[in-house]
């Protein structure tokens, strides 16, 4: 199984290897960092509640991206609020992205070619890992949104993060997103930690908007 942050990044890579424009936005960067934090929570490395993020295991992971995030978390001797980490880790987003892209290349899903990251397989399925074949994230999201089944925890979280990070616009029109709004509400972030992350992302977005407004209209 691929991790949440790997699948988040794959949602931003289109069929010709270019990166979707939405990946350059602050909303995507917040959601991408949020995916790393949720993945750590699912691996029982951290605990997230409305007040703070606590490290509960410092064991080294086999994922270089998560190890970098854990290193940053452990640099603070006292627990910090979720919003703090979403903002603080923005300084590492470029390196977090690079490490995640490299991990996808190492797994034979992407290949680097002239500043682009091309899909190795055209079947929209990931290479077989541990004997299991997994459909690509966009296909799973579309099947969930257009169907009536309850998604897995991972897919529910991924849909919520894609929504918060503006990635749905990469493969759905605005009209389709509006039409699917009720279904999105039904299937997004059924997992508690993911719901807290999405709320914190919204709060950070509002803070960024307020700061931009104040800076453009100084008193």
Where do the model's predicted regions map?
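Glycine-rich, aromatic-bearing surface loops/beta-hairpins
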Residues: 127-219
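Amphipathic, coiled-coil-like alpha-helical scaffolding segments used for oligomerization/assembly
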Residues: 103-109
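Short aromatic/hydrophobic-glycine micro-motifs
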Residues: 45, 109-110
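Short, amphipathic alpha-helical interface elements at domain boundaries
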Residues: 1-93, 202-219
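Short, Lys/Arg-rich nucleic-acid/phosphate-binding segment
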Residues: 51-53, 114-119
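Short, structured motif recognition centered on aromatic/hydrophobic residues
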Residues: 37-40, 104, 158-163
